[in-house]
Swiss-Prot record:
One of its GO terms (molecular function) is protein dimerization activity. SUPFAM superfamilies: S-adenosyl-L-methionine-dependent methyltransferases, Winged helix' DNA-binding domain. S-adenosyl-L-methionine binds at G219, G220, D244, D266, M267, R282. Disruption phenotype: Impairs the production of griseofulvin, but accumulates the intermediates desmethyl-dechlorogriseofulvin, desmethyl- dehydrogriseofulvin A and desmethyl-griseofulvin. Its EC number is 2.1.1.-. It catalyses: desmethyl-dehydrogriseofulvin + S-adenosyl-L-methionine = dehydrogriseofulvin + S-adenosyl-L-homocysteine + H(+). This is O-methyltransferase gsfD. It comes from Penicillium aethiopicum. One of its GO terms (biological process) is griseofulvin biosynthetic process. Keywords: Methyltransferase, S-adenosyl-L-methionine, Transferase. PROSITE patterns: SAM_OMT_II. The gene is gsfD.
């Protein structure tokens, strides 16, 4: 019979093989995700109620530490170095306090964001190099900025007797940030998926010509998604339009979006582009409560023709075995803008209320899906 020490050695040997058995570039990403959830369950079973509570209570400081490291430039310095660096080396490069760097490095090492190769010597790993990317820095700092709304959420819900109809102007964000402005008045930074490969655009655009309106990116920000479609379908295949509020579109240059039309538009107003092949919403509806989402959807439906498709690209929650990220995202939406991360059934119900029906769902990475809706057939 194995001793506890032997069990630990066997467990350690299995863990050391994890990155080989389930690499980040594995062909079937779902296999790696399943393995990750099994590993998380194993960690949970090793926790006592006390250690679980401790990990949960102190978790925000992991994010804050990563945010400080991003702003200081620690990840950048380590990623550029071909040799391990000490806190003094890093502090010298950044012209900052070595004692502070040492404290941050301990936190990063404890949370596997850097590797301590020998005592006091640190090297970059895959996580370190990922934190150099602008979208990852933006994601971290966005979450740091959202923290006031998370902290205010319990008291805000209590003050409203847990009976609320939130929206972006009346939610925990205003309380936590001590402001009357919405969170969305802050700059946004997101990573865009190459969603073109997940949806059959070629079939939808098969008979298009230069005058057809192929793709309307509603609330499309700086047009990254529209450019992905444009890159796959040249101007000769039809027109592509990005719509957003003036304070967003005035940041776009024609050079950054060649052969893409830019249009000022508020989703609450009637949709001016009629009969497009595809109307596209990425990460839009989750920012809004049901009654506001229905208002927007009704405007889209009124502009659609029988051949039009409305594509809703959102992270969808599952009622059975939801991922941690999706449940965190849901509360984040509630706290910051009164929105919701909906399930497939909840999103379908919204569409049906405005005369649309779901005609297909395509899965994309990280819990996200593209839901296609068309006008209900009589």
């Amino acid at each position: 019979m194995s001793t506890p020490e032997q069990w630990i050695q066997e467990f350690e040997a299995l863990c050391s093989r994890a990155s080989i058995l389930f690499p980040s570039g594995i062909e079937d990403e779902n296999i790696r995700i399943r393995a990750l959830r099994i590993a998380e369950k194993a960690v949970h079973q090793l926790h006592t109620p006390m250690t679980f509570a401790e990990a949960q209570t102190w978790a925000p400081l992991e994010l804050f530490g990563a945010g400080v490291a991003c702003e200081m430039g620690i990840f950048d310095v380590l990623s550029k170095s071909s040799v391990p660096l000490s806190p003094v080396d890093i502090a010298t490069e950044l012209n900052t306090d070595p004692a502070l760097v040492a404290r941050i490095m301990r936190l990063l090492d404890a949370h596997y964001m850097v590797d301590q190769v020998t005592l006091g010597q640190y090297a970059a790993n895959a996580i370190t190099r990922d934190y150099v990317q602008p979208y990852r820095k933006g994601n971290v700092m966005t979450q740091v900025a959202l923290m006031p709304s998370y902290f205010a959420l319990p008291a805000w819900l209590r003050d409203n007797d847990y009976k609320v109809r939130p929206d972006a102007n009346h939610c925990a964000w205003q309380v936590g940030a001590n402001t009357t402005k919405t969170f969305w008045e802050m700059p946004r930074t997101t990573q865009e998926d190459d969603f073109v490969t997940f949806y059959p655009f070629e079939a939808v655009f098969s008979t298009s010509n230069v005058d057809d309106i192929l793709f309307v990116d509603i609330g499309g920000g700086l047009g990254h998604q529209a450019m992905r479609v444009r890159s796959a379908f040249p101007r000769s295949r039809g027109r592509i339009i990005v719509q957003d509020l003036p304070q967003v579109t005035n940041k776009i240059t024609t050079a950054s979006l060649p052969d893409v039309e830019i249009m000022d538009h508020d989703m609450a107003d009637p949709q001016p582009v009629k009969g497009a092949r595809v109307y596209y919403l990425r990460g839009v509806l989750h920012n809004h409560a049901d009654h506001i989402s229905i208002k927007y959807l009704s405007q889209f439906a009124a502009a659609m023709s029988p051949e039009s498709r409305l594509l809703i690209h959102e992270a969808l929650a599952t009622d059975l075995n939801p991922t941690k990220n999706i449940t965190r995202f849901d509360l984040s939406m509630l706290a910051s803008c009164g929105g919701a991360q909906r399930s497939e059934a909840e999103q379908k119900a919204l569409l049906e209320k405005v005369g649309l029906e779901v005609s297909g769902v395509w899965s994309t990475p990280r819990d996200w899906s593209i839901m296609e809706a068309r006008l209900k057939r009589e």
